[in-house]
């Protein structure tokens, strides 16, 4: 079921992917709560854990995640991306709730943990709750990206940063094709397409139509190569 979930996700078939991700998590003993009261309690504790992580990092020692924790993070990251597209409300509450479970780990040691924490920035920029908190998450994770035993990639981090800048009205350096290339090299067409989408919108707003057209060309190439519904949909919309 886990392989099916990842296959569906890579093809942009998000509703079915989430269904199989949930089944896998249930088999691993990490079933997400459905009771509204439990969800709200997890949300509150998850938010408090995030604040503690961002503003009081010196008061705690990180733990090393075990194999199950790493496997769960490998599931939660793509699941969160899929939920953001099909159910923003569930995406917000589930992602905040999961922070409580993973904030105690040294997220700089594992790419998926690092990407998940970085991606939490979207919870506050996408919803418009707090661009300040969204930026704080980006700065915090970037500052610690070289503090682990091995370097983590900032490619996905730059996708989230691009989204934050677009939503907050901040200017940035524009399209970095190396980000697209790196994401595609690991088969992450979702993040590559999202990055190009945000750049396309920015270039259109600035009147830089030549660069906007370049983004379209990249998206067409991704759609033709990966045949996933998400990049095809984004290309069609643009």
Model-derived features with residue positions:
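Amphipathic helix-loop-helix modules that constitute alpha-helical solenoid scaffolds
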Residues: 7-93, 126, 207, 217, ...
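Extended non-membrane alpha-helical scaffolds
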Residues: 78-238
